[in-house]
């Protein structure tokens, strides 16, 4: 059963969240953190799979996404920046933990949500997580990020809340280049044409992000790649990196392996990685999604 939750944002307005409730007493909590230009109900199939296994699942629409687009109507913008959006995710975690204090707690972040999850690991090492799953992540060349952030900062001086097609093209424009005979500009998401078509058709998906959000995301990525922040993580926390071998965000497994390697260099004691050949960005929505679901389940259950 899925229910809606609302709470005050640390930025502005109200945050919408969903809770998927299993039958009987839950055995653990899984908190999902979604990606850019999407919303939590897209994870309904995965969440329902987890509830059938006895998990309580929670997830919030980030500011400017899903039903958390408030009265100002601004989509794809974080009022207060990256760390304010992180605080909204942390508030859901705190509220859920307060209600279910004895349950193991697993964090799952996808795409932009993977960068948010990694921020939480670096910034809040004592938040009481049992395990973390980092899905569809990447690693950016650290030397290039400050220059890129400076360029975007200049654009933001005009109006950081407005959608910016040019910046969006800089960040995402090359993602389809390795897809043979693409039908749409979003074929890089999944080999499942129905998933891609539903994404394109939905008004809450695939919109152009603001310059401010793209800047904030780059600042977040820069934060999670700094050595001192990586070393701040809870060294005993189990972490599972999963991604598609044909995911351009990775890119194509390389950045995922680099991220896992940097976690190990930072002293993380239990780091696993699984790259799914031929899978694109949204492995939870791929044609072999059931395989991914089962792998995630089996990995989580090792730590319960």
Explain the meaning of each model-derived region.
Residues 78-97:
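Alpha/beta-hydrolase active-site loop
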Residues 241-243:
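Short beta-strand/loop motif that positions the catalytic acidic residue
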Residues 100-111:
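Alpha/beta-hydrolase fold nucleophile elbow
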Residues 266, 270-304:
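Catalytic active-site module of serine/aspartate enzymes centered on a nucleophile-bearing elbow/loop
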Residues 117-204:
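Alpha/beta-hydrolase-fold enzymes
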Residues 42-72:
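Conserved alpha/beta-hydrolase
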Residues 34-38, 111, 245-246:
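Active-site glycine-rich loops that stabilize anionic/oxyanionic intermediates
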Residues 1-24:
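N-terminal cap/lid segment of alpha/beta-hydrolase-fold proteins
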């Amino acid at each position: 059963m899925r229910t809606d939750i609302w709470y005050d944002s640390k930025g502005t307005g109200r945050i919408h969240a969903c809770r998927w409730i299993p039958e009987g007493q839950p055995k653990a909590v899984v908190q999902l953190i979604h990606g850019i230009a999407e919303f939590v109900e897209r994870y309904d199939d995965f969440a329902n799979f987890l509830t059938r296994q006895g998990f309580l699942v929670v997830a919030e629409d980030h500011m400017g996404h899903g039903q958390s687009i408030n009265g100002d109507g601004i989509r794809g913008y974080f009022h207060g920046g990256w760390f304010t959006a992180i605080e909204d995710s942390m508030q859901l975690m705190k509220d859920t933990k307060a209600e279910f204090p004895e349950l193991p707690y697993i964090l799952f972040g996808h795409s932009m949500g993977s960068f948010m999850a990694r921020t939480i690991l670096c910034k809040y090492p004592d938040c009481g997580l049992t395990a973390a799953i980092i899905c569809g992540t990447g690693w950016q060349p650290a030397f290039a990020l400050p220059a890129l952030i400076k360029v975007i900062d200049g654009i933001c001086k005009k109006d950081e809340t407005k959608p910016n097609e040019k910046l969006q093209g800089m960040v995402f424009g090359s993602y389809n280049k390795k897809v043979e005979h693409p039908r749409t500009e979003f074929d890089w998401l999944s080999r499942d044409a129905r998933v891609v078509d539903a994404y394109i058709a939905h008004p809450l998906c695939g919109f152009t992000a603001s310059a401010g959000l793209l800047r904030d995301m780059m600042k977040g990525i820069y934060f999670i790649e700094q050595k001192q922040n990586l070393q701040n993580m809870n060294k005993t926390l189990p972490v599972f990196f999963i991604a598609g071998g044909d995911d351009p965000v990775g890119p194509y497994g390389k950045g995922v392996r680099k991220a896992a390697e940097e976690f190990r260099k930072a002293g993380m004691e239990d780091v696993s990685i699984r790259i799914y050949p031929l899978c694109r960005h949204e492995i939870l929505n791929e044609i072999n999604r059931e395989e991914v679901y089962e792998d995630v389940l089996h990995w989580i259950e090792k730590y319960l």
